[in-house]
Amino acid sequence: MTVTQLRSAGRLAQLAGHVNGARQFSTRPALRKELQDAYILSAARTPTAKFNGSFLSVSAPKLGAVAIKAALEKSKVPVEKITDVYMGNVLQGSVGQAPARQAVIFAGLPKEIEATTINKVCASGLKAVTLAAQNIQMGLSEAQIAGGMENMSQVPYYVSRASGLPAFGHVKMEDGLIKDGLTDVYDQFHMGNCAENTVKNHNITREQQDEYAIQSYRNAQKAWEDKAFADEIAPVTVKSRKGETVIDTDEGFKDVKFDKIPSLKPAFVRDGSGTVTAANSSTLNDGASALVLGSKAIAQQYGSGSRVLAKICGYADAATAPIDFPVAPAKAVPIALERAGITKDQVAIWEFNEAFASVILANSKILGLEGAKVNPLGGAISLGHALGSSGSRILTTLLHQLKPGEYGVAAICNGGGAATALVVQRVESV
């Protein structure tokens, strides 16, 4: 028998063994790891600047770098323990390649640290935190950084390469901020129109929205007066021809005339039935926030004395029809609570993103949170809504309010019809 014939015979015998069930499988037991607990060791945020305000010349990644650097310093975690950074960033036109990577390098972190940019619209920053938490829970990393960043003031206007530009004459441009940040792609109208739909579906009045907005501003003003944000703020040094200016305070909460709010015209529906105005909606802003997450071992070693040390108890995403995005948190929150093993009555403080006053009013109504501590220090209406940062910003603010033992929930809706929610418990030590 030739060599070729021997090989063929061996192959036939092998195939026959498969057919007759003689195939051999490994008897080694599968490797299994128990899910680990993930903790938050520190959280920091830049002030939130007004649209075309103090951060006009500071890119989103550079704002992110300030937040990352501050959070890392507060955490006491050695930088060599950090393996990955996740940063939310929504409006990436003209920001440059890999915004999260830029933030890592601008923060002075080692170039060996991997970075990933997350775009889940307004929920980007909170989604970034859940992704980092998953890596730690699965034992893939000891420590990670997560957060978000946005500079809405720097978003460019667009001219499509496929527009067939004329040799001469006028050229039509699109506002990148409206197109990629503020418009429902499917119905082709503003996010505010979705809020108007929520108002009608849940019988929310103009007066209720205005009252909520006024309370948001008053809460924010009192919070700043009481220095409630002092521990979470990472000042930003802005350079200009006149020298350097240190920005250490949110810019929008003072700019309100309460007597004018009830008389403002609706901003989105102008047929006489609209109720959503510039005052009872969030503002356009620039800012960043970041948190350091670690395993139980990291929390035990470096978490002592942390102002915000907390265990991540559960989190969830949920989706709705795009037009119903304002009430998506009401779907995500119950799932997150169930995964955390607690009920809503055990939650001490709730932080919902105030995209619109109607978002808080509708979700509070659906979830039965009337009378609960919701956004006690103000929210996106008064403090600002820097899209990619907002999810991690509300979590940062939540953590600085909780006392050891207390549970808190951060929840945020996002364009396209979805939301992310996260449950934490403050702990004194691990």
Curated annotation (Swiss-Prot):
Name the family the entry cites: Belongs to the thiolase-like superfamily. Thiolase family.
> Which transformation does this protein catalyse, written as a reaction?
2 acetyl-CoA = acetoacetyl-CoA + CoA
* Classification via Pfam families: Thiolase_C, Thiolase_N
- Where do the annotations place chloride binding? 414
Q: What does this protein do?
A: Mitochondrial acetyl-CoA acetyltransferase that catalyzes both the formation and degradation of acetoacetyl-CoA. Seems not to be involved in ergosterol biosynthesis. Plays an important role in growth, morphogenesis and maintaining mitochondrial function including the response to oxidative stresses.
What residues does CoA bind to? 260, 282
| InterPro entries the record matches | Thiolase, Thiolase-like, Thiolase_acyl_enz_int_AS, Thiolase_AS, Thiolase_C, Thiolase_N
GO BP annotations, alphabetical order? fatty acid beta-oxidation
Subunit annotation: Homotetramer.
User: What is this protein's name?
Assistant: Acetyl-CoA acetyltransferase FG05087, mitochondrial
Q: Per UniProt, which keywords does this protein have?
A: Acyltransferase, Metal-binding, Mitochondrion, Potassium, Transferase, Transit peptide
What highest taxon heads this organism's lineage? Eukaryota
Required cofactor(s): K(+)
Spell out the catalytic residues. 122, 385, 413
* Cysteines engaged in disulfide bonds, as pairs: none
Q: What is its EC number?
A: 2.3.1.9
Where's the transit peptide in this chain? 1-32
Organism, scientific name? Gibberella zeae (strain ATCC MYA-4620 / CBS 123657 / FGSC 9075 / NRRL 31084 / PH-1) (Wheat head blight fungus)
One GO location term (cellular component): mitochondrion
Task: Write out the GO MF terms.
Answer: acetyl-CoA C-acetyltransferase activity; metal ion binding
Predominant location: mitochondrion
Report the subcellular localization: Mitochondrion
Keyword Metal-binding appears in the UniProt entry: yes
Which annotated residues bind K(+)? 217, 278
Enzyme group, top EC level?
transferase
